[in-house]
Amino acid sequence: MAGLKQHSGLVVPLDAANVDTDAIIPKQFLQAITRVGFGKHLFHEWRYLDAEETRPNPEFVLNFPQYQGATILLARKNLGCGSSREHAPWALADYGFKVMIAPSFADIFYNNSLNNHMLPIKLSEQEVDEIFHWVWANPGKQIHVDLEAKTVTVGDKVYHFELDEFRRHCLLEGLDNIGLTLQHEDAIAAYEKKIPAFLR
């Protein structure tokens, strides 16, 4: 899996707090257990005017022409609250988001996002508000995220964020739980050789 070292992308300014996982991906779309195919249902209730998803809501920000192809989601506090369903980050990732920026995230959603190789960045409410105003004033312009330096560059301003070093290492190297285990493959093989045959 490719690592996430630096990323430049368009930002969708979702000007809402307490966006829960039911809003991100409604329960009627949770039958599948694979990670693909959820992107088209992302924010279903807000994004479409009909249940069949044939009539996009022109007033929902994800449908605005200037934000098509966006890979960074900007939101207010407590993003991903509600149930612990992992389908929420699956839907965001399948849509194409790689980075999320908010003042705070629900704990389980935050961890699930990292496990699915998306970067949730916590900045202060004032900093997030500044970025909202910049995005509104600069449609079509990208911002730059540098995970190695732990910075977000918006126009001529640089914001610094914190991330647990273990989580940062996993994102930089593109490692999931299996990948982490395989980093110790030689040590595991050496240990297995020491185990008596009848215990193998």
From Swiss-Prot:
Q: Provide GO CC annotations from the record.
A: 3-isopropylmalate dehydratase complex
First-tier enzyme category under EC = lyase
Q: Which UniProt keywords apply?
A: Amino-acid biosynthesis, Branched-chain amino acid biosynthesis, Leucine biosynthesis, Lyase
Provide the reaction this enzyme catalyses.
Answer: (2R,3S)-3-isopropylmalate = (2S)-2-isopropylmalate
Q: Does the keyword Ubl conjugation apply?
A: no
Report the SUPFAM superfamilies cross-referenced here. LeuD/IlvD-like
Q: In which pathway does it act?
A: Amino-acid biosynthesis; L-leucine biosynthesis; L-leucine from 3-methyl-2-oxobutanoate: step 2/4
Q: What is an example of a GO molecular function annotated in this UniProt entry? A: 3-isopropylmalate dehydratase activity
Can the keyword Lyase be found in this entry's annotation? yes
In its UniProt record, which GO terms are filed under biological process?
Answer: L-leucine biosynthetic process
Classify the source by domain of life: Bacteria
- Which EC number applies? 4.2.1.33
Family named by the database record: Belongs to the LeuD family. LeuD type 1 subfamily.
**What does the subunit section of this Swiss-Prot or TrEMBL entry state?**
Heterodimer of LeuC and LeuD.
Q: What does this protein do?
A: Catalyzes the isomerization between 2-isopropylmalate and 3-isopropylmalate, via the formation of 2-isopropylmaleate.
Q: Which HAMAP family match?
A: LeuD_type1
What protein name does the entry list? 3-isopropylmalate dehydratase small subunit
Give the originating organism. Actinobacillus succinogenes (strain ATCC 55618 / DSM 22257 / CCUG 43843 / 130Z)
**Origin organism lineage:** Bacteria, Pseudomonadati, Pseudomonadota, Gammaproteobacteria, Pasteurellales
Point out the gene that encodes the protein: leuD
